[in-house]
C-alpha cells in the first residue's frame, strides 16, 4: 500500500470536509493523507469517488482540482482496471502511454478556472515522458514487470462489452 510509505503529518477524512464527496465503494478509506516521502511533501488520496456512484462529474474531479490548488505539481494515479489486451494478465502493472476517453461527460465541461489550466488543453503530451522513463527505470531496477499500454476510460460499473473489447 503506497500510503503506508508516507511519513504522515495529518489525515483528514473526506466526511469532515463540508460538501466533499465521500465514496460508497467498500475498501475506499476516504481520507486525505498529508506528509512526506523521502522529504518530498505529498498529499495522498486513500480512496476516491467514482462517477458510477452517481456523483456529478464536478464532484468526481473536485479532489484533483483541490490538490492542484494546494500546489500539487505532479499527479500520480493508481487504480484497478479490467483489461482487453490478451497479452496482459490479472495483476499486471501497466504504465499508461496514452488514453482513449470513452467517458461521458468530459470532466472539463463546466466553468473554466484559469488557475487550473486553459479551456482547451493540448492532450498530445498529457503523460510526462521524463517521469515515464523514471518509472520504467525504477521498475527495471526493482525487477518489477511493467506493461505499457493505452487506457480506455469508461464510466462503469459494468465490465466491457464484446464490442468494447474488440475496439
Description of each model-found segment:
Residues 118-122, 126, 149-156:
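Glycine/Thr-rich beta-alpha phosphate-binding loop at enzyme active sites
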Residues 60-61, 132, 162-165:
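Short, well-ordered alpha-helical scaffold segments within catalytic/effector domains
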Residues 137-167:
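Active-site/ligand-binding-proximal alpha/beta "capping" segment
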Residues 1-123:
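Metabolite-binding pocket within alpha/beta catalytic cores that recognizes anionic/polar moieties
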Residues 66, 83, 130, 134-141, ...:
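Alpha-helical scaffold segments in soluble metabolic enzymes
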Residues 28, 126-136, 155-160:
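A general structural motif
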